[in-house]
């Protein structure tokens, strides 16, 4: 039996897809890259914005046309969680609907016609998924918590993934050890509020926090680097930042989702912090780790966002000079506080703001890239670069999250750590040579 999975959205969905494959492998399903050859087609969905949701029904229609006569189509993930049985009504070709909090039930629903399993109070935190040896992966994803307790006015995730529960540490460490034995060098820890780990478990558990978990994972032989996403700025207190700075295996790059640089808008968003508080955290972090790479999320056009509010966002962009920017126009979502508000920023205004934000960020990246020339970094090799079947170098990321293209005559294998020197840059790209090459 063959299964094809299309994954939309975030890294959490990518990991959920791996867990789906893990469960299906117990039933002798093998993954295929060809939906026409599949006996089961799964669409793992995203609902953070409206666009991926619209895409879902287009995808269902396309798969229904090309699938084998008896092949089943299943819709999984966040859109499945909040639309439930409505998906079956809109798309009769769908055989079942499986919510984001119900991954472990896949082996049950594939045997039921028109099954709907979307309960967000279902607890998978202590579910020991079989280790799925898909292939040796240099960088691997690892869930450490599920759900979200925050009440951000724009976000549907608490409605689709339920309450926040931490996965027991022993299960996390056991899976990390298996990943390391399979060749993983870098872990990416996943959670909706990943740095709030330990706040709540579903059963009795020793008191631990996120920094404790990072320390334990750092002890695993073979694991060279640890990253994590997505943290919440509210949980970046001094103690966390200090331990982040001291742990040599924790990469010195961090995601700090700003959302808006306006304290007024942040209050409307129910983010729990102000512009000044956010900047204070950045200042503290840069004092501890001057070379730190910082990425962020920014929403423009949130209801009632004024010109002054947007200028505040631009001011934070200038002060922090983020290394990576994920920016979007506000998208109203069902089951959210802001989704019910009638006030809307005109699309042409939001589009203009987004363009200005993104263009300035591109300029900042060029300015920062110039300053990198002559500096050295240690890069984890991810891919070899070839021209006409001849190895000309490799690609990888630095400890600070910078993607670097390296010219190198010597063969370097994925997973190796190599010291490189930046020699040039182009449109924000960093180009280097291997030291000693």
Swiss-Prot record:
Function (record text): Catalyzes the methylthiolation of N6-(dimethylallyl)adenosine (i(6)A), leading to the formation of 2-methylthio-N6-(dimethylallyl)adenosine (ms(2)i(6)A) at position 37 in tRNAs that read codons beginning with uridine.
Residues of the MTTase N-terminal domain: 1-115
Designated gene of the protein: miaB
InterPro entries xrefs: Elp3/MiaA/NifB-like_rSAM, Methylthiotransferase, Methylthiotransferase_CS, Methylthiotransferase_N, Methylthiotransferase_N_sf, MiaB_methiolase, rSAM, rSAM_horseshoe
Pfam families: Radical_SAM (PF04055), UPF0004 (PF00919)
Major localisation: cytoplasm
Family matches, as PROSITE patterns: MTTASE_N, MTTASE_RADICAL, RADICAL_SAM, TRAM
Compartments reported by the entry: Cytoplasm
Binding-site residues for [4Fe-4S] cluster 1, renumbered to this chain: 10, 46, 78
Stretches assigned to the TRAM domain: 370-436
Species, as recorded: Helicobacter pylori (strain Shi470)
Protein name as catalogued: tRNA-2-methylthio-N(6)-dimethylallyladenosine synthase
């Amino acid at each position: 039996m063959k299964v094809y999975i299309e994954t939309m959205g975030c890294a959490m969905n990518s990991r959920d897809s791996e867990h789906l494959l893990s469960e299906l492998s117990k039933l002798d399903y093998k993954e295929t890259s060809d939906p026409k050859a599949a006996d089961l087609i799964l669409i793992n969905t995203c609902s953070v914005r409206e666009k991926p949701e619209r895409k879902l029904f287009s995808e269902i229609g396309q798969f229904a046309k090309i699938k084998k006569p008896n092949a089943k189509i299943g819709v999984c993930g966040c859109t499945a969680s909040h639309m439930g049985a409505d998906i079956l009504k809109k798309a009769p070709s769908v055989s079942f609907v499986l919510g984001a909090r119900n991954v472990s039930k896949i082996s049950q629903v594939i045997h039921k016609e028109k099954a709907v399993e979307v309960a967000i109070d279902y607890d998978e935190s202590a579910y020991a998924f079989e280790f799925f040896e898909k292939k040796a992966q240099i960088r691997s994803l690892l869930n450490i918590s599920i759900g979200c307790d925050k009440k951000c006015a724009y976000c549907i995730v608490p409605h689709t993934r339920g309450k926040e529960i931490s996965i027991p540490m022993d299960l996390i460490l056991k899976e990390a050890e298996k990943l390391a034995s399979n060749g993983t060098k870098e872990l990416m820890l996943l959670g909706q509020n990943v740095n709030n780990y330990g706040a709540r478990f579903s059963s009795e558990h020793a008191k631990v926090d996120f920094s404790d978990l990072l320390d334990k994972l750092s002890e695993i032989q073979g694991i060279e680097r640890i990253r994590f996403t997505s943290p919440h700025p509210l949980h970046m207190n001094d103690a966390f930042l200090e331990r982040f700075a001291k742990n040599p295996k924790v990469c010195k790059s961090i995601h700090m989702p700003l959302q808006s640089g306006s304290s007024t808008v942040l209050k409307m968003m129910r983010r729990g912090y102000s512009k000044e508080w956010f900047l204070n955290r950045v200042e503290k972090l840069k004092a501890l780790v001057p070379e730190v790479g910082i990425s962020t999320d920014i929403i423009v056009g949130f209801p009632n966002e004024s010109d002054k509010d947007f200028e505040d966002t631009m001011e934070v962009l200038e002060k922090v000079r983020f290394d990576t920017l994920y920016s979007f126009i506000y998208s109203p979502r069902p089951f959210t506080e802001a989704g019910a508000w009638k006030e809307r920023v005109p699309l042409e205004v939001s589009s203009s703001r987004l363009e200005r934000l993104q263009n300035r960020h591109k300029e900042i990246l060029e300015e920062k890239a110039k300053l990198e020339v002559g500096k050295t970094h240690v890069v984890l090799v991810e891919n070899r670069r070839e021209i006409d079947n001849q190895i000309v170098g490799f690609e990888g990321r630095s400890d600070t999250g910078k993607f670097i293209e390296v010219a190198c005559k010597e063969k370097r294998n994925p997973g190796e750590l190599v010291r490189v020197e930046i020699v040039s840059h182009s449109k924000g790209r960093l180009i280097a040579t291997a030291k000693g090459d």
